A protein has these predicted regions:
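Extracellular serine-dependent O-acyl
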Residues: 107, 204-209, 218-248, 260-272
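Non-catalytic cap/lid and distal C-terminal segments of serine-dependent acyl enzymes
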Residues: 32-41, 48, 120-121, 131-138, ...
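Positively charged n-region of N-terminal signal peptides that target proteins for export
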Residues: 1-4
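Conserved SGNH/GDSL esterase-like catalytic core that processes O-acyl groups on lipids
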Residues: 62-158, 176, 214-219
Length: 638
């Protein structure tokens, strides 16, 4: 008898011992009309479908050239010949976009509009169908009058090619109020696991909510029951539908609603996959996180993954790089979102909780956008090592408080001293005054800008001379708001204008008194980014007796007549070129600050000016880090 049992087990195991491709992930999809697809398929839904996203035809469909049981590129419709868009469409699209390139994703979708969950009870299906209306009977015929059996047969065939990695369910409208629904779903789920020789730990069940109450869902009360499903099935996860737009009948989703819901199914599956060994999904905590916090995380494609616990919130968004991403909440009150691939470098971001913009408590904060903001660093490759700390001598960034006679107030500036400053007590150093941009402050260059690491690395490599770098507030922390009835250009000229007296009458004298500096113009430079570039021009050009090096990075310098501006300082090119030891203008290729046009105008006048373009960057900190790296090696070598 034991031999017979062993033989039967071996035969059973042999059924599934196909040459499965572990990199072909297959998902079984079932449910009623919202899984079947009720929304019209739009042009965007049929374009750019990745070759790695496949569907197995659940029925013959001659008009589409599809044969039951065969794999095809997953161009909708995915269910039957004339069904609409489904959550499975954007579930699969999102997975192949986020997963490694060697992973394929396949879906098998068997769904019947208007059905109860009992339709997927294989043993009692025929009895159940007999009591249903003719239209439902006709749909069931497409699946041989037993949708469960059809799904199982297709799944067995699919297992010859790949590995079943999950089950997607969207059903419940026709079972609204049925408190036994979770147990009925459990029966279907366990039957599939048994019949396909699957383990629950490897094949989670993802069940979507029906149209939410926030969309006036007619069956929204069913969501309370759906959310108890994990109590019946520990490996079940509920996909929230809040914020997914509903159709006019308030039973089905719009195409946009299906897209959002499909992405949410995918987001949940990706989160689960991250925990699996050898999943190929790699994310790392952002370097800008507070130590000990795992989120936000960044993946190899540059996407940022956010989590935020706010069980009482009704709506959350992430505002990052000028785009707002809706977050979605699970049953435990944990909100998640994933961005599109972001440019490398530093980016401010905010969480918007029920309309209120707040910082992320998991992230360090940075002063930017005229307020304290969260920030995230999307890492560069080795080309970004110049602004990362290396095994070289490190300087210091000091916070210095001083009294401003011109403003009658105490102020703070940040001062970088090179690594050798303490060990060479008799040596004096040149000074670079370095300004931030609009809506930022004196901390910007040493936090967002990584100025100290850039300087340490350049000095250690011998590319630039040791120097002090002084950063003060440009008095432009608050937004620019012209007064009503005033000329905007005149108002703009006043924005941050208090800084000009501060730097000339308070800051430079204080630095020269406090630190071992070389105090002549030949050893003093000034540069700034954006509005700091504007302030650099306004400070240096009228006072060339105090500065001999000038830099502007994406300078906010507009509407100047190069021949007449600043009392005609550029009119006599020979005089200017002899007076200024080095003149630098830089910007990113993706921004429109007019820098190149200004350079062309200056060169036509005979002005010697170096021009640098940061490839692929816009008005952002990566541009300015690169500009600083290009600028400082030219200082104080004349």
């Amino acid at each position: 008898m034991k031999k017979i049992i062993v033989l039967c087990c071996l035969l059973c195991a042999g059924i599934f011992a196909f040459a499965q491709d572990p990199n072909f992930h297959i998902y079984l999809c079932l449910g009623q009309s919202n899984m079947e697809g009720n929304a019209k398929i739009e042009a965007q839904d049929t374009c750019n479908v990745n070759e790695r996203f496949l569907m197995m035809a659940a029925v013959d469909c001659p008009s589409l050239g599809r044969v039951k049981g065969q794999w095809y590129k997953a161009v909708p419709p995915l269910v039957r010949c004339h069904t609409g868009l489904t959550p499975a469409d954007y579930f699969g699209r999102t997975l192949v976009e986020r997963l490694p390139d060697n992973i394929k994703v396949g879906v098998i979708n068997v769904a019947v509009g208007g059905c109860r969950i009992e339709l997927f009870d294989e043993e009692n299906c025929e009895e159940h169908i007999a009591s249903q209306p003719e239209w439902l009977k006709n749909t069931a015929k497409a699946y041989g009058n037993n949708p469960y059996r059809r799904l199982k047969e297709l799944a067995v065939e699919a297992q010859k090619a790949g590995v079943i990695k999950g089950i997607l369910l969207h059903q419940g409208e026709s079972n609204t109020g049925d408190k036994e629904w979770p147990q009925k779903v459990k029966r279907v789920y366990e039957n599939l696991l048994r019949d396909l020789n699957l383990q629950a730990k490897d094949v989670p069940l993802l069940a979507g909510e029906v149209v939410h109450a926030d969309q006036n869902g007619r069956c929204a009360s069913m969501n309370e029951i759906i959310n108890t499903l994990p109590q019946a099935i520990p490996t079940a996860y509920v996909i929230p539908s809040s914020g997914c737009p509903a159709a006019e009948d308030n039973l089905h989703f719009t195409a946009e609603g299906y897209r959002k819901l499909g992405v949410r199914y995918a987001e949940k599956r990706l989160l689960l996959l991250e925990k699996e060994p050898n999943s190929g999904i790699t994310t790392e905590p952002a370097s800008t996180n507070i130590p000990g916090y795992d989120y936000p995380r960044v993946d190899k494609e540059g996407r940022a993954h956010f989590r935020f616990y706010a069980p009482q919130a009704n709506r959350l968004q992430v505002d990052c790089c000028g785009k707002k991403y809706d977050m979605w909440k699970d049953a435990g009150g944990l909100w998640t979102a994933t961005t599109n691939p972001l440019p490398v470098g530093f980016h401010y971001y905010f969480l918007i909780a029920d309309g209120v913009s707040v910082t992320d408590p998991s992230s360090y904060t940075f002063f930017g956008c005229c307020r304290m903001a969260s920030g995230i660093e999307i890492p560069e490759g080795e080309e970004g090592d110049y602004y990362r700390p290396q095994q070289v001598p490190h300087g210091q960034v000091r916070s210095c408080t001083y009294y401003s006679e011109t403003q009658k107030e105490f102020r703070r500036c940040m001062v970088y001293t090179p690594a050798e400053y303490e060990t060479h007590p008799k040596k004096r150093y040149p000074v670079l005054y370095l300004q931030h941009g609009m809506g930022e402050d004196e901390t910007g260059w040493s936090t967002q800008g990584k100025m100290n690491h850039i300087m340490d690395n350049l000095i250690a490599s011998g590319q630039c001379v040791p120097m002090l770098v002084v950063m003060d507030s440009g008095d432009v922390e608050a937004p620019f708001r012209p007064r009503p009835g005033k000329d905007v250009n005149e108002e703009r000229a006043l924005y941050g204008a208090t800084f000009y007296d501060v730097i000339l009458k308070d800051l430079i004298p204080m630095i020269d008194r406090t630190f071992r500096t070389k105090t002549d113009r030949e050893h003093r430079a000034m540069a700034g980014l954006s509005w700091g570039g504007h302030q650099t021009f306004n400070t240096v050009l009228p006072h060339l007796d105090k500065f001999s090096y000038i830099g502007s990075f994406s300078g906010a310098i507009f509407g100047l007549d190069m021949k007449t501006c600043f009392n005609g300082v550029f009119a006599d090119a020979d005089k200017f070129n002899k007076k200024v030891n080095y003149f630098f203008l830089g910007c990113g290729t993706e921004e429109q600050m007019g820098t190149k046009k200004m350079v062309d105008s200056l060169r036509k006048l005979g002005i010697e000016v170096d021009y640098y373009e940061s490839q692929g960057t816009a008005h952002e900190w990566l541009t300015w880090r690169r500009c600083l790296k290009e600028f400082v090696p030219h200082l104080f070598k004349h």
